[in-house]
Swiss-Prot record:
Protein purpose: Involved in the GO system responsible for removing an oxidatively damaged form of guanine (7,8-dihydro-8-oxoguanine, 8-oxo-dGTP) from DNA and the nucleotide pool. 8-oxo-dGTP is inserted opposite dA and dC residues of template DNA with almost equal efficiency thus leading to A.T to G.C transversions. Involved in base excision repair of DNA damaged by oxidation or by mutagenic agents. Acts as a DNA glycosylase that recognizes and removes damaged bases. Has a preference for oxidized purines, such as 8-oxo-dGTP. Has AP (apurinic/apyrimidinic) lyase activity and introduces nicks in the DNA strand.
High-level lineage: Bacteria, Bacillati, Bacillota, Bacilli, Bacillales
Catalytic activity: Hydrolysis of DNA containing ring-opened 7-methylguanine residues, releasing 2,6-diamino-4-hydroxy-5-(N-methyl)formamidopyrimidine; 2'-deoxyribonucleotide-(2'-deoxyribose 5'-phosphate)-2'-deoxyribonucleotide-DNA = a 3'-end 2'-deoxyribonucleotide-(2,3-dehydro-2,3-deoxyribose 5'-phosphate)-DNA + a 5'-end 5'-phospho-2'-deoxyribonucleoside-DNA + H(+)
Zn finger (FPG-type) start-end: 240-274
Keywords associated with the record: DNA damage, DNA repair, DNA-binding, Glycosidase, Hydrolase, Lyase, Metal-binding, Multifunctional enzyme, Zinc, Zinc-finger
Name of the protein: Formamidopyrimidine-DNA glycosylase
Membership in a protein family: Belongs to the FPG family.
Subunit architecture: Monomer.
Note on how the cofactor is bound: Binds 1 zinc ion per subunit.
Any one Gene Ontology molecular-function term assigned to this protein's record: class I DNA-(apurinic or apyrimidinic site) endonuclease activity
UniProt cross-references to InterPro entries, sorted A to Z: DNA_glyclase/AP_lyase_DNA-bd, DNA_glyclase_Znf_dom_DNA_BS, Formamido-pyr_DNA_Glyclase, FPG_cat, MutM-like_N-ter, Ribosomal_uS13-like_H2TH, Znf_DNA_glyclase/AP_lyase, Znf_FPG/IleRS
Annotated organism of origin: Bacillus subtilis (strain 168)
Length: 276
Protein backbone atom coordinates (compact mmCIF):
# COMPACT_ATOMS: atom_id res chain seq x y z
CA UNK A 1 0.00 0.00 0.00
CA UNK A 2 1.37 3.45 -0.85
CA UNK A 3 2.34 5.27 2.34
CA UNK A 4 2.72 8.99 2.97
CA UNK A 5 5.86 9.53 0.83
CA UNK A 6 4.35 7.72 -2.14
CA UNK A 7 1.01 9.50 -1.89
CA UNK A 8 2.75 12.86 -1.50
CA UNK A 9 4.83 12.13 -4.60
CA UNK A 10 1.67 11.21 -6.52
CA UNK A 11 0.07 14.44 -5.32
CA UNK A 12 2.98 16.51 -6.57
CA UNK A 13 3.27 14.84 -9.97
CA UNK A 14 -0.50 14.74 -10.47
CA UNK A 15 -0.81 18.44 -9.64
CA UNK A 16 1.53 19.28 -12.47
CA UNK A 17 -0.52 17.19 -14.87
CA UNK A 18 -4.13 18.13 -14.11
CA UNK A 19 -4.30 21.34 -12.08
CA UNK A 20 -6.54 23.79 -13.93
CA UNK A 21 -8.17 21.15 -16.12
CA UNK A 22 -11.96 20.97 -16.27
CA UNK A 23 -13.81 17.67 -16.10
CA UNK A 24 -16.18 17.13 -19.03
CA UNK A 25 -17.49 13.72 -18.04
CA UNK A 26 -16.80 10.75 -15.75
CA UNK A 27 -17.04 7.10 -16.77
CA UNK A 28 -17.32 4.66 -13.86
CA UNK A 29 -16.61 1.05 -14.78
CA UNK A 30 -16.37 -0.37 -11.25
CA UNK A 31 -19.10 1.29 -9.15
CA UNK A 32 -17.88 -0.17 -5.84
CA UNK A 33 -15.00 2.32 -5.85
CA UNK A 34 -17.48 5.18 -5.37
CA UNK A 35 -18.43 5.34 -1.68
CA UNK A 36 -20.10 8.77 -1.53
CA UNK A 37 -22.59 9.67 -2.86
CA UNK A 38 -24.32 6.29 -2.77
CA UNK A 39 -25.23 6.43 -6.45
CA UNK A 40 -22.24 6.46 -8.85
CA UNK A 41 -24.36 8.29 -11.41
CA UNK A 42 -24.73 11.20 -9.00
CA UNK A 43 -20.95 11.21 -8.44
CA UNK A 44 -20.38 11.51 -12.18
CA UNK A 45 -23.07 14.13 -12.64
CA UNK A 46 -21.72 16.38 -9.88
CA UNK A 47 -18.16 16.28 -11.21
CA UNK A 48 -19.10 17.26 -14.77
CA UNK A 49 -18.05 20.87 -15.33
CA UNK A 50 -15.83 21.03 -12.23
CA UNK A 51 -12.28 22.40 -12.51
CA UNK A 52 -9.42 20.90 -10.52
CA UNK A 53 -8.17 23.86 -8.49
CA UNK A 54 -5.55 21.99 -6.46
CA UNK A 55 -4.69 18.58 -5.05
CA UNK A 56 -4.00 18.14 -1.35
CA UNK A 57 -3.17 15.21 0.88
CA UNK A 58 -4.31 14.01 4.30
CA UNK A 59 -2.31 11.01 5.46
CA UNK A 60 -2.59 8.44 2.70
CA UNK A 61 -5.59 10.17 1.09
CA UNK A 62 -5.53 12.46 -1.96
CA UNK A 63 -7.86 15.47 -1.83
CA UNK A 64 -8.94 16.88 -5.20
CA UNK A 65 -10.17 20.43 -4.55
CA UNK A 66 -12.71 21.34 -7.22
CA UNK A 67 -14.97 24.37 -7.74
CA UNK A 68 -17.80 23.10 -5.55
CA UNK A 69 -16.58 19.76 -4.18
CA UNK A 70 -13.66 17.91 -2.62
CA UNK A 71 -12.99 14.41 -3.90
CA UNK A 72 -11.21 12.23 -1.34
CA UNK A 73 -9.37 9.33 -2.97
CA UNK A 74 -7.58 6.43 -1.29
CA UNK A 75 -5.27 4.36 -3.50
CA UNK A 76 -5.22 1.37 -1.13
CA UNK A 77 -2.98 -1.43 -2.45
CA UNK A 78 -2.59 -0.80 -6.17
CA UNK A 79 -4.46 2.36 -7.16
CA UNK A 80 -2.76 4.64 -9.69
CA UNK A 81 -3.66 7.83 -11.56
CA UNK A 82 -2.29 8.62 -14.99
CA UNK A 83 -3.01 11.26 -17.64
CA UNK A 84 -3.57 9.94 -21.16
CA UNK A 85 -4.74 11.02 -24.56
CA UNK A 86 -8.25 9.77 -25.30
CA UNK A 87 -7.05 7.67 -28.22
CA UNK A 88 -4.55 5.76 -26.08
CA UNK A 89 -5.75 2.22 -25.32
CA UNK A 90 -6.66 1.31 -21.75
CA UNK A 91 -7.17 -2.12 -20.15
CA UNK A 92 -9.52 -4.02 -17.86
CA UNK A 93 -7.89 -2.53 -14.75
CA UNK A 94 -8.93 1.06 -15.57
CA UNK A 95 -12.05 1.60 -13.47
CA UNK A 96 -12.73 5.36 -13.51
CA UNK A 97 -12.04 7.75 -16.39
CA UNK A 98 -12.25 11.53 -15.98
CA UNK A 99 -12.40 13.01 -19.48
CA UNK A 100 -11.29 16.65 -19.57
CA UNK A 101 -12.56 19.42 -21.80
CA UNK A 102 -9.16 19.51 -23.54
CA UNK A 103 -9.60 15.88 -24.62
CA UNK A 104 -7.15 14.32 -22.19
CA UNK A 105 -8.22 11.63 -19.73
CA UNK A 106 -7.28 11.16 -16.10
CA UNK A 107 -7.54 7.42 -15.62
CA UNK A 108 -7.74 5.60 -12.31
CA UNK A 109 -6.25 2.12 -12.61
CA UNK A 110 -6.50 -0.41 -9.79
CA UNK A 111 -5.62 -4.09 -10.23
CA UNK A 112 -6.99 -5.03 -6.81
CA UNK A 113 -10.09 -2.77 -6.94
CA UNK A 114 -9.61 -1.77 -3.30
CA UNK A 115 -9.40 2.00 -3.86
CA UNK A 116 -12.15 4.37 -2.75
CA UNK A 117 -13.55 7.77 -3.75
CA UNK A 118 -15.74 10.04 -1.62
CA UNK A 119 -17.26 13.37 -2.69
CA UNK A 120 -17.89 16.17 -0.19
CA UNK A 121 -18.78 19.82 -0.16
CA UNK A 122 -15.73 21.92 0.82
CA UNK A 123 -15.13 21.79 4.57
CA UNK A 124 -17.29 18.72 5.14
CA UNK A 125 -14.53 16.21 4.50
CA UNK A 126 -12.56 16.84 7.70
CA UNK A 127 -15.51 15.99 9.93
CA UNK A 128 -16.66 12.89 8.07
CA UNK A 129 -15.24 9.44 7.51
CA UNK A 130 -12.78 8.49 6.21
CA UNK A 131 -10.84 11.58 7.42
CA UNK A 132 -12.51 12.45 10.72
CA UNK A 133 -10.60 10.03 12.94
CA UNK A 134 -7.12 10.61 11.56
CA UNK A 135 -4.27 11.73 13.80
CA UNK A 136 -1.89 14.61 13.01
CA UNK A 137 0.41 14.86 10.02
CA UNK A 138 4.04 14.02 10.85
CA UNK A 139 5.10 17.55 9.87
CA UNK A 140 2.30 19.26 11.81
CA UNK A 141 3.15 21.49 14.77
CA UNK A 142 1.00 19.34 17.03
CA UNK A 143 3.04 16.22 16.26
CA UNK A 144 5.64 16.77 18.97
CA UNK A 145 7.61 14.25 20.99
CA UNK A 146 5.38 15.16 23.94
CA UNK A 147 2.29 14.31 21.88
CA UNK A 148 3.83 11.01 20.81
CA UNK A 149 4.76 10.20 24.40
CA UNK A 150 1.20 10.84 25.54
CA UNK A 151 -0.30 8.66 22.80
CA UNK A 152 2.09 5.76 23.34
CA UNK A 153 1.71 5.88 27.11
CA UNK A 154 -1.98 5.02 26.72
CA UNK A 155 -1.46 1.65 25.04
CA UNK A 156 0.36 -1.57 25.85
CA UNK A 157 0.33 -2.65 22.22
CA UNK A 158 3.59 -3.31 20.46
CA UNK A 159 5.10 -0.02 19.30
CA UNK A 160 4.96 -1.26 15.69
CA UNK A 161 1.20 -1.75 15.98
CA UNK A 162 0.70 1.58 17.76
CA UNK A 163 2.52 3.49 15.01
CA UNK A 164 0.50 1.80 12.27
CA UNK A 165 -2.66 3.15 13.91
CA UNK A 166 -3.62 6.19 11.81
CA UNK A 167 -5.18 7.77 14.91
CA UNK A 168 -1.68 8.09 16.39
CA UNK A 169 -0.06 9.76 13.40
CA UNK A 170 -1.05 9.53 9.75
CA UNK A 171 0.85 8.18 6.80
CA UNK A 172 2.96 5.47 8.38
CA UNK A 173 2.73 1.94 7.01
CA UNK A 174 4.85 -1.18 7.13
CA UNK A 175 7.82 0.26 5.28
CA UNK A 176 8.37 3.46 7.21
CA UNK A 177 7.50 2.11 10.64
CA UNK A 178 10.13 -0.60 10.20
CA UNK A 179 12.69 1.91 8.94
CA UNK A 180 12.01 4.49 11.68
CA UNK A 181 12.13 1.86 14.43
CA UNK A 182 15.48 0.63 13.13
CA UNK A 183 16.94 4.12 13.03
CA UNK A 184 15.73 4.72 16.57
CA UNK A 185 17.08 1.38 17.81
CA UNK A 186 13.66 0.20 18.98
CA UNK A 187 12.56 -3.44 18.79
CA UNK A 188 9.16 -3.57 17.03
CA UNK A 189 7.64 -5.78 19.75
CA UNK A 190 8.51 -3.37 22.57
CA UNK A 191 5.38 -2.30 24.44
CA UNK A 192 4.55 1.26 23.44
CA UNK A 193 4.01 2.36 27.04
CA UNK A 194 7.43 1.07 28.09
CA UNK A 195 9.51 3.41 25.93
CA UNK A 196 11.68 5.91 27.78
CA UNK A 197 11.36 9.65 27.21
CA UNK A 198 14.76 9.67 25.50
CA UNK A 199 13.79 6.84 23.18
CA UNK A 200 10.51 8.53 22.26
CA UNK A 201 12.35 11.73 21.37
CA UNK A 202 14.68 9.76 19.13
CA UNK A 203 11.81 7.84 17.57
CA UNK A 204 9.86 11.05 16.95
CA UNK A 205 12.84 12.57 15.14
CA UNK A 206 13.45 9.45 13.08
CA UNK A 207 9.82 9.23 11.98
CA UNK A 208 10.05 12.75 10.61
CA UNK A 209 13.52 12.23 9.11
CA UNK A 210 12.65 8.93 7.45
CA UNK A 211 9.48 10.27 5.86
CA UNK A 212 11.14 13.44 4.59
CA UNK A 213 14.05 11.52 3.08
CA UNK A 214 11.59 9.16 1.41
CA UNK A 215 9.60 12.07 -0.02
CA UNK A 216 12.82 13.60 -1.34
CA UNK A 217 13.59 10.27 -3.06
CA UNK A 218 10.13 9.99 -4.62
CA UNK A 219 8.96 7.21 -2.31
CA UNK A 220 9.78 3.49 -2.32
CA UNK A 221 9.06 1.08 -5.14
CA UNK A 222 9.11 -2.41 -3.66
CA UNK A 223 6.34 -3.94 -5.78
CA UNK A 224 4.49 -1.91 -8.39
CA UNK A 225 4.42 1.68 -7.14
CA UNK A 226 4.93 4.42 -9.73
CA UNK A 227 4.04 8.10 -9.57
CA UNK A 228 1.57 9.78 -11.93
CA UNK A 229 4.30 10.29 -14.53
CA UNK A 230 5.14 6.59 -14.57
CA UNK A 231 8.37 6.98 -12.58
CA UNK A 232 9.45 4.61 -9.81
CA UNK A 233 10.56 5.77 -6.37
CA UNK A 234 14.18 5.46 -5.26
CA UNK A 235 14.04 5.33 -1.46
CA UNK A 236 14.10 1.52 -1.50
CA UNK A 237 17.81 1.89 -2.22
CA UNK A 238 18.16 3.51 1.21
CA UNK A 239 16.19 0.93 3.20
CA UNK A 240 18.02 -0.48 6.19
CA UNK A 241 15.66 -3.34 7.04
CA UNK A 242 12.42 -3.41 5.04
CA UNK A 243 12.57 -6.18 2.45
CA UNK A 244 16.07 -7.13 3.65
CA UNK A 245 15.37 -10.47 5.33
CA UNK A 246 18.53 -12.61 5.57
CA UNK A 247 20.68 -9.77 4.30
CA UNK A 248 23.43 -8.33 6.54
CA UNK A 249 22.56 -5.25 8.59
CA UNK A 250 24.30 -2.19 7.18
CA UNK A 251 25.28 -1.16 10.70
CA UNK A 252 26.50 -4.36 12.34
CA UNK A 253 26.42 -7.22 9.83
CA UNK A 254 23.79 -9.26 11.67
CA UNK A 255 21.28 -10.88 9.33
CA UNK A 256 18.01 -8.98 9.16
CA UNK A 257 15.10 -10.90 10.69
CA UNK A 258 11.45 -10.97 9.71
CA UNK A 259 8.69 -11.70 12.21
CA UNK A 260 4.96 -11.04 12.44
CA UNK A 261 3.80 -8.22 14.71
CA UNK A 262 0.09 -7.50 14.92
CA UNK A 263 -0.47 -9.56 11.81
CA UNK A 264 2.06 -7.56 9.78
CA UNK A 265 5.36 -8.78 8.39
CA UNK A 266 8.07 -6.87 10.26
CA UNK A 267 11.77 -6.45 9.49
CA UNK A 268 14.39 -5.61 12.12
CA UNK A 269 17.96 -6.21 13.28
CA UNK A 270 18.08 -8.29 16.47
CA UNK A 271 21.40 -6.73 17.49
CA UNK A 272 20.68 -3.07 16.75
CA UNK A 273 17.10 -3.32 18.04
CA UNK A 274 17.22 -5.31 21.27
CA UNK A 275 13.96 -6.21 22.95
CA UNK A 276 13.47 -4.59 26.36
Amino acid sequence: MPELPEVETVRRTLTGLVKGKTIKSVEIRWPNIIKRPAEPEEFARKLAGETIQSIGRRGKFLLFHLDHYVMVSHLRMEGKYGLHQAEEPDDKHVHVIFTMTDGTQLRYRDVRKFGTMHLFKPGEEAGELPLSQLGPEPDAEEFTSAYLKDRLAKTNRAVKTALLDQKTVVGLGNIYVDEALFRAGVHPETKANQLSDKTIKTLHAEIKNTLQEAIDAGGSTVRSYINSQGEIGMFQLQHFVYGKKDEPCKNCGTMISKIVVGGRGTHFCAKCQTKK
